[in-house]
């Protein structure tokens, strides 16, 4: 009997084998003849134009303000937009959290326009600090700022001469917990802290290094004390100490300069609809390590640069699940459209200059966003070698995240294209049973 069952199973497998062999293996591709540009949701320091069909890091050229190489800035430390991920969007924020007021939130300080500026305010010096996050570490050696090209203070002082008396500049290569601490604490390294400055155009030089974060903080100076004394002699009340008089110093632009390639450049593709559920095989890519020598990029097998690729797949078009608070304080699932357009955030301010505070849960308020692991795989293990299997579940949607790494200012990697093996599912569902040939329907 057992031999009969074995024979039946062998015949069944033999009959199925031709169908398996006929499963067509194709590829899904990015790069080469399939453009990179326009297929991304995030790109930080990515050059789409240098070599057609390929991507590589943007090179920081001498004399070019690095701030101008970045776009899609936010003026909050913790942006409320859906999909924000730390390190995938540049930020500038004032004080502890930032705000949306364009007259003071710093947006005028990164617009490359010397006629726009943040007006001085009659508020404490302790609130006068800005933090700049370039999203990735870049090779930098100079931080600068300057006064506006025109205009006047309320007392008639030309803004062009309204220099900042005292300030501190500090820098840091990577993210840390310091940004969650309130107040103008210096970052990992202080590169300048003058106590008496009269220059309207300031340039602070330091040894070139990878820097992601810069913090500019206003400090008290004897020049401020002199202005306060002059104010008292003239019969006016108040001064820098009690915020009755606007602080000295007006800034029009921040500037950051350096030379070379960033430590990281990142690219996140859109979520791509493949049309039908697919099985996925190996990931292939072509990447070329290069070095910038005497004004030209030359191939350099020993370049300290490489590409790292992660992939995830899913069965619907959104890897997240969105929730709203109920009357009992619990959470219920809602659509992304309702979460994004109809619900309020869980944070608010009691005044324009106050920090954000957590509101009590209530209906109409955003609750958690969780990962839909039932329908989406997690990101694959980062792959740095072409031809390795992805080991991902089947899906009808795919997304790619690419990081172009470099640990030398002159070295970089160019990614020409990548492709993923895929094949359609042979059957949505297969049912069967083993039976003796003499009794095929027991």
Predicted regions located by residue number:
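Beta-strand-rich ligand- or partner-binding modules
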Residues: 22-442
């Amino acid at each position: 009997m057992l031999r009969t069952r074995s024979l039946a199973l062998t015949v069944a497998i033999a009959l199925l084998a031709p169908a398996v062999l006929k499963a067509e293996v194709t590829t899904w591709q990015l790069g080469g003849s399939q453009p990179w540009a326009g297929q991304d949701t995030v790109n930080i320091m990515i050059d789409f134009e240098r070599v057609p069909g390929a991507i590589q890091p943007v090179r920081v050229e001498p004399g070019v303000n690095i701030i101008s190489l970045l776009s899609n800035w936010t003026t909050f430390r913790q942006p409320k937009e859906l999909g924000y991920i730390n390190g995938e969007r540049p930020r500038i924020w004032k004080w502890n959290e930032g705000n949306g007021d364009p007259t003071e939130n710093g947006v005028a300080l990164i617009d490359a326009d010397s006629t726009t500026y943040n007006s001085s305010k009659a508020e404490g010096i302790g609130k006068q600090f800005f933090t700049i996050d370039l999203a990735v570490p870049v090779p930098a050696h100079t931080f600068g700022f300057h006064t506006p090209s025109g205009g006047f203070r309320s007392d008639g002082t030309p803004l062009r001469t309204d220099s900042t008396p005292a300030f501190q500049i500090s820098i840091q290569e990577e993210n840390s917990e310091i940004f969650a601490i309130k107040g103008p604490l210096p970052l990992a390294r202080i590169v300048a802290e003058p106590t008496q400055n009269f220059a309207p155009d300031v340039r602070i030089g330091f040894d070139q290094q990878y820097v992601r974060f810069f913090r500019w903080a206003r400090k008290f100076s004897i020049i401020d004390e002199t202005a306060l004394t002059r104010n008292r002699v003239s019969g006016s009340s108040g001064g820098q100490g009690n915020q009755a008089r606007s602080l000295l110093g007006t800034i029009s632009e921040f500037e950051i300069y350096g030379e070379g390639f960033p430590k990281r450049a990142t690219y996140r593709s859109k979520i791509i609809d493949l049309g039908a559920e697919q099985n996925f095989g190996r990931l292939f890519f072509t990447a070329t390590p290069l070095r910038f020598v005497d004004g030209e990029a030359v191939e350099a097998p020993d370049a300290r640069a490489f590409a790292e690729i992660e992939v995830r797949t899913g069965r619907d078009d959104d890897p997240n699940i969105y929730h709203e608070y109920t009357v009992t304080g619990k959470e219920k699932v809602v659509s992304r459209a309702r979460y994004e357009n109809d619900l309020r955030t869980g944070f608010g301010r009691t005044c324009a200059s106050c920090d954000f505070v957590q509101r009590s849960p209530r209906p109409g308020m955003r609750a958690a966003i969780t990962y839909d692991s039932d329908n989406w795989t997690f990101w694959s293990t980062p792959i740095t070698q072409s031809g390795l299997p992805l080991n991902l579940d089947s899906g009808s949607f795919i997304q790619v995240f690419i990081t172009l790494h470099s640990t030398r200012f002159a070295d970089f990697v160019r990614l020409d294209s990548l492709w993923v093996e895929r094949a359609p599912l042979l059957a949505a569902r297969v049912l069967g049973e083993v039976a003796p040939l003499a009794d095929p329907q027991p």
